[in-house]
């Protein structure tokens, strides 16, 4: 079984990946993803860089408390087949939105919990695509302005592996993805990860030995504001595993709403530093909606200046609002 061969406890059945079944998907070289789109990177080190985003399906977290007032927790949670749903997601399910909506991009945007809920909850699995690596690559290439990763003017388009959590078992397919003939001019890959998933040995060896593209780990450990427990969210040994990939770059990025979150981020950074992780630290304001984001942005920027940490905006929120495909 796939889950027995990985050092994490992702609940495949709850994520809707067993009934696919994921084992057969892997054998057939098929990747399930919710969307692929071309935009500018809105967060972190490469803000403003033209990028193609590949959002894989499935996550080991739910982050149900994002967007709630401090001290408030998701109430009246309903359980269905062992799955705890965010209240807003449950409301959509009660209204049969997942059955009456025809297109992924027409699904409503929610304001609490994970804003990419359609990439993690199994009821929305049918909105996601299950494609061979050849088909995935064709989709990605079709999004590029010149049909190639390095443009005629010498500028390159980055590939962002995001989710969900892109470093679940799908990582087994990434060698074939990156070695595809139409990916040979790819120069930069960023993994946007919650930093809880160890790398598969073969994939780690591949990343260490290849010298064709730069690898960046955008590590965004979840704080208590997300609703995820510290002991499952803060994993310095996983960050060390990523840092062990020769030539790769890394930064920590924390989503924060106020000084309480920022103090907690400081404690988390101390844990990573103690483990030997020395990398830049970014703070990003919480806020999937422009109104919420604008309330937090100046305070977070001021605190970054106080503490010497780096500030990252959510550029895509300012440019496009919180919408699928941005």
What are these regions (language model features)?
Residues 4-19, 24-27, 31, 65-213:
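Conserved Radical SAM active-site core
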Residues 29, 50-52, 110, 215, ...:
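A generic secondary-structure signal marking the coil-to-beta-strand transition
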Residues 32-35, 52-55, 161:
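Short, hydrophobic/glycine-enriched beta-strand segments
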Residues 35-37, 41-51:
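S-adenosyl-L-methionine
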Residues 44-47, 63-68, 324:
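Short, glycine/acidic-enriched capping/hinge loops at junctions between secondary-structure elements
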Residues 47-52, 56-61:
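Conserved N-terminal beta1-alpha1 strand-loop-helix module at the mouth
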Residues 137, 141-158, 166-326:
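Conserved AdoMet/S-adenosylmethionine-binding subsite of the radical SAM
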């Amino acid at each position: 079984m796939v889950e027995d061969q990985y050092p994490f406890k992702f609940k495949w059945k709850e994520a809707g990946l067993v009934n696919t079944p994921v084992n057969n998907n892997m054998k057939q070289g098929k990747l399930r993803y919710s969307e692929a789109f071309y935009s500018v990177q809105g967060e972190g080190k490469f803000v403003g860089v033209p990028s193609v985003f590949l959002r894989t399906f499935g996550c080991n977290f739910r982050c149900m408390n994002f967007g709630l007032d401090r001290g408030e927790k998701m109430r009246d949670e309903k359980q269905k087949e062992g799955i705890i749903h965010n209240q807003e997601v449950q409301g959509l399910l009660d209204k049969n939105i997942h059955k009456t909506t025809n297109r992924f991009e027409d699904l409503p945007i929610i304001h609490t919990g994970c804003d990419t809920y359609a990439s993690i909850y199994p009821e929305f699995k049918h909105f996601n695509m299950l494609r061979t690596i050849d088909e995935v690559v064709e989709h990605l290439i079709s999004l590029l302005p010149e049909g190639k990763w390095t443009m005629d003017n010498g500028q390159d388009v980055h590939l962002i592996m995001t989710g969900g959590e892109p470093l679940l078992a799908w990582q087994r397919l990434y060698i074939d993805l990156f070695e595809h003939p139409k990916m040979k001019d790819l120069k930069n890959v960023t993994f946007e990860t919650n930093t809880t998933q160890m790398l598969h040995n073969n994939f780690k060896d591949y990343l260490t030995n290849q010298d064709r593209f730069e690898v960046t780990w955008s590590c965004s450990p979840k704080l208590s504001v997300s609703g995820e427990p510290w002991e499952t969210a803060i994993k310095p040994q996983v960050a060390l595993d990523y840092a062990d990939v020769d030539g790769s770059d890394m930064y920590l990025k924390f989503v924060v709403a106020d000084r309480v979150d920022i103090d907690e981020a400081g404690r988390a950074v101390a844990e990573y530093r103690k483990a030997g992780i020395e990398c830049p630290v970014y703070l990003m304001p919480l806020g999937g909606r422009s109104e919420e984001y604008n309330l937090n942005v100046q305070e977070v920027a001021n605190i970054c200046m106080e503490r010497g940490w780096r500030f990252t905006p959510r550029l895509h929120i300012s440019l496009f609002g919180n919408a699928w495909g941005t």
